[in-house]
């Protein structure tokens, strides 16, 4: 009897949420039809129960996104990517849910109407994956700008030490200094940790780092599949499709509860590991079959 009552209550709750979402509208804003953004949109569409209107900024004749949104007067705004969030964050009277953004804190702070899912993967998780793929690594190099990623680096250093790994971090304040700081790590490290620091990650620095990796047989852990395709050994990154689903769940809560102040900002709940087997072979690294089975392989 109690079990049947629980089922009835659950079904009634779902019916109320669906009814609440009926006739409501979500506006999705994205800068362009970029493949990961399209995946995120698919995930969102699969979960969100409201009507959905999409605005692609690059396809607008006039670049006044806010004016277009105000004409639609949606119940919730979905910002896919940093450019989209930058455009819509001035809107204060409509809830905004962001996704596909690495560091939302860089452009938002205490706005009560903005919540979302960041692409941040905790440093603990990244170090754990690194230690499983490369169990003999004891010294990991890192180059960072303290104004960009200083807090991340300090926390990562503490975690690495607790795992028996020494984090050797060189500080830079200009992109011009990044290559020489990487060069300074030669002979001192077993692997390099490439973090999403906008001061460090430039096309010139990435090219230098990839050459450094091959010349010194130093594997790179990075944050994006594209760098694994270019020559890094491994990346741990978010799943755009699942992030879209996560954002859709947030939007549903906002639309049904009518109180977006209680929908907290959070991190992506699922990641994907990419491994470049050609690079592993070139560096003389053998990776456990069990780890390979759970990763996406780039040959």
Q: What do the predicted segments below correspond to?
A:
Residues 7-17:
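Bacterial N-terminal signal peptides
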Residues 21-299:
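Short hydrophobic alpha-helices and adjacent helix-cap/hinge residues
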